[in-house]
Regions:
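Cytoplasmic, intrinsically disordered regulatory regions of membrane-associated signaling receptors
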Residues: 41-43, 194-335
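Conserved, structured regulatory domains from eukaryotic proteins
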Residues: 7, 19-20, 25, 135, ...
Length: 335
């Protein structure tokens, strides 16, 4: 008897038995074996990092392509952002930019380990999958650590304003941003050595698409969802402080279209750095929520790249205006 591995592409229709496809699936069987191993290489989607839901096969396929395109664009944009940071001396001397670039590195790690995770899960190497799962979890936690530090840095700039000097400020931020995730991952490994590895995207279908991630549901909920909740709440408060600050600065001033547009882009840029869009994950139990979550968060790195480019153009424009003012004030030199 011949057996073939397939994936269910039905939507619970009456003709669901016709909706099976072997595309992307490989049947692994040797003569004499009593079981068949199926290896399917269908892409997964960004929402699995937060929510264990089960969209229809057609929606899952679309979400997978959205994630692939979004993460690829983000990885490209983040790489260019690093080059822009290195090539501009003013960026390298700016403390805020150094905080931003740390978040950029964390997002690069996240995308680098998320994109091949499903492909690695389809391989037979358990140790490689464990490494990928551990690295992916660490990268996600580091990303949220740096987004929280973005909120803290914003608090110092907008609320404290004066007397904000902190000795070895960037070193202390780095210890928290990179060290806390390492401690959390180490504790998970100490408590449960099998906490990382092959993890089905849909828990109700263990033979379906899988990635290398946290296998222990409790560890995932406590470390991942717990940290995301805390960071999201803190950064929402920081965003509220920013809005209040912008409103107070505009009081007594004549508002125009230009200033309003500038404030909107400022808030959008800050929201991206603070990871506010990750809050959509709490409402992504629906298919529509999954689409919004995947689009916004897979593109987070690319949006940060656009924000960096706009900041660079703004800095260059300001420098040009200063040079023009200096030349106008000094006037032509007499012989």
């Amino acid at each position: 008897m011949f057996s073939d591995c397939v994936i269910d592409e039905s939507n619970s229709s009456l003709l669901s038995w016709l909706d099976y496809s072997s595309d992307g699936c490989q049947t692994l069987w040797r003569r004499g074996q009593t079981h068949i191993t199926c290896s399917c290489d269908h892409l997964t989607y960004f929402g699995v990092l937060m929510v264990n839901s089960s969209p229809s096969p057609s929606d899952q396929k679309i979400l997978s392509y959205i994630t692939l395109i979004g993460c690829s664009l983000s990885l490209f944009g983040l790489s260019i952002t690093v080059l822009l940071f290195i090539s501009h001396k003013k960026f390298r001397a700016d403390v805020s930019m150094k905080v931003h670039i740390s978040l950029v590195f964390a997002l690069i790690l996240l995308n680098v380990h998320f994109l091949p995770s499903e492909m690695v899960a389809a391989l037979s190497s358990t140790s490689l999958c464990v490494y990928m799962a551990l690295a992916l979890h660490y990268s996600l936690l580091a990303t949220f650590s740096w987004m929280a530090l973005e909120g803290f840095h914003l608090y110092l700039l907008l609320v404290r304003v004066f007397n904000i000097y902190i000795r070895r400020y960037l070193l202390k931020l780095s210890v928290v941003g990179w060290g806390v995730p390492a401690v959390i991952v180490s504790l998970v490994v100490i408590i449960d050595r099998t906490a990382y590895g092959y993890t089905p995207v849909d828990s109700s279908n263990p033979n379906g698409t899988a990635i290398c991630y946290v296998t222990n549901t409790t560890a995932m909920m406590v470390t991942t969802m717990g940290m995301i909740c805390l960071v999201f709440l803190f950064n929402v408060i920081m965003l509220g402080v920013t809005v209040r600050r912008l409103i107070s600065l505009r009081q007594g001033q004549e508002t125009n279209r230009s200033s309003t547009t500038k404030d909107i882009f400022t808030l959008l840029g800050i929201s991206t750095l603070l990871g506010i869009t990750w809050g959509v994950g709490f409402f992504s139990v629906t298919t529509a929520g999954q689409y919004v979550f995947c689009i916004l968060n897979s593109l987070q790195g690319f949006l940060i790249f656009l924000w960096f480019v706009m900041s660079l153009r703004k800095a260059q424009k300001a420098a040009a205006e200063i040079r023009n003012d200096t030349q106008t004030t000094s006037g032509p030199k007499s012989k």
